């Protein structure tokens, strides 16, 4: 069998990039005989370093990360490239793929990492045309694929219900914690002019469904009794309009230095930001997995998190939960994790055992089973 993997939609700094870089790294460690072609963009090639004769990277121009160009290439050019390479199966871990592969007699396996278009369409970043195109392509790809991989049982149940597809077509494969959070070596990457004490951290994309303003409202209440604590956001800004709303709220409600934004930060600094934080908070409305809470657990950082969607499934009893719409509940969660040292210590111990259940070697092994790689 000849397999192709389409990773052309990968953007620098995106969660999909985390998936794809780890997938490639662990795939190259696995023994198999099949020929594999991996389609990637130029700015992504630096993250790959294969020494395998049976794995070949096919480099595509960076402009294909734009969804409009990507759709055209994927639907009208990629199938012919696959046919020319005599590919038997395509794996697309990018939420959608070519919808006419059956005409080319090519098996299609899709991985879905989002349910946003169906449950929180109005909170998606980007313009409405882009978002409608994304939803349309995801729906058509789900119906067209031969097998579908999702990140949680919550995601499987939701997709099966919304799209009316057969359960036995859908496989649940959990993601893993990135190796940089697991290394026993001491991490020496520290930010200049940053005080690594008395702060709460939230690492997330700046999008409306991540509910950042509710964190700020809760923190404003929390500050009345915890004046020295700061709130630090490490953001990837995907919705500029929403970020301006956040900045306006901060300017009107907080003194200078109480809220810190670290935008577009290199991932190498995250280990020590997690490790030295008083706690990690994540108030998302909608997740089919969510890696950052597990990363926090790996650095002995207690986690306060939304009680919605897949988050309870993924974090189990190793996190403290709150209602993301209830400002007082979020505030009380922050207070408890700061004030109740014994409870926080128990959460840290649970988290330290819990995150170890999620590793990329297992993710790749289970995916290879679905792909029938021997």
Question: Where would I find each of the regions flagged by the language model?
Answer:
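Nucleotide-activated donor-binding/catalytic signature segment of Leloir-type glycosyltransferases, i.e.
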Residues: 244-268
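Conserved acidic donor-binding segment of nucleotide-sugar-dependent glycosyltransferases
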Residues: 320-327, 336-341
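Glycosyltransferase donor-sugar binding loop
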Residues: 38-44, 177, 230-245, 263
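Aromatic "clamp/platform" in nucleotide-sugar-dependent glycosyltransferases that forms part
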Residues: 285
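Short alpha-helical donor nucleotide-sugar binding micro-motif in glycosyltransferases
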Residues: 82, 272-277
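Conserved donor-binding/catalytic core segment of Leloir-type glycosyltransferases
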Residues: 194-219, 232
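Short hydrophobic beta-strand element within catalytic cores of glycosyltransferases
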Residues: 298, 302-305
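Membrane-proximal helix-turn-helix segments that form the acceptor-binding/catalytic region
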Residues: 128-148
């Amino acid at each position: 069998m000849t397999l192709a993997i389409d990773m052309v939609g990968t953007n620098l700094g995106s969660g999909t990039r985390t998936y794809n870089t780890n997938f490639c790294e662990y795939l190259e460690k696995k023994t198999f005989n099949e020929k594999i072609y991996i389609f990637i963009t130029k700015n992504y090639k630096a993250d790959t370093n294969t020494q395998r004769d049976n794995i070949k990277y096919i480099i595509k121009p960076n402009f294909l990360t734009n969804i409009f160009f990507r759709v055209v290439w994927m639907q009208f050019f990629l199938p012919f490239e696959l046919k020319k390479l005599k590919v038997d199966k395509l794996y697309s871990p990018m939420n959608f793929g070519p919808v006419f592969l059956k005409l080319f007699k090519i098996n299609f396996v899709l991985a879905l990492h989002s349910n946003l278009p169906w449950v929180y369409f109005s909170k998606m970043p980007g313009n409405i045309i882009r978002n409608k195109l994304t939803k349309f392509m995801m729906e058509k790809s789900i119906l067209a694929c031969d097998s579908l991989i999702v990140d949680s049982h919550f995601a499987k149940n939701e997709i099966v219900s919304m799209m009316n597809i057969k359960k036995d077509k859908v496989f649940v494969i959990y993601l893993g914690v990135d190796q940089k959070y697991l290394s026993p070596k001491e991490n020496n990457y520290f930010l200049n002019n940053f005080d690594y004490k008395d702060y709460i951290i939230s690492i997330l994309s700046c999008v409306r469904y991540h509910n950042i303003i509710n964190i700020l409202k809760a923190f404003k209440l929390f500050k009345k009794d915890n004046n020295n604590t700061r709130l630090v956001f490490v953001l990837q800004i995907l919705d500029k309009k929403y970020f301006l709303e956040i900045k306006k709220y901060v300017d009107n409600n907080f003194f200078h230095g109480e809220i810190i934004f670290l935008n577009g930060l290199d991932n190498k600094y995250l280990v020590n930001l997690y490790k030295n934080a008083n706690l990690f908070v994540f108030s998302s409305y909608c997740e089919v997995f969510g890696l950052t809470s597990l990363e926090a657990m790996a650095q002995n950082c207690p986690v306060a998190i939304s009680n919605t969607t897949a988050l309870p499934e993924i974090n189990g009893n190793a996190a403290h939960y709150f209602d993301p719409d209830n400002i007082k509940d979020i505030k009380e969660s922050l207070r408890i994790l700061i004030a109740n040292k014994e409870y926080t210590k128990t959460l840290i111990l649970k988290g330290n055992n819990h995150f170890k259940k999620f590793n990329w070697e297992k993710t790749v092994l289970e995916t290879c089973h679905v792909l029938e790689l021997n």
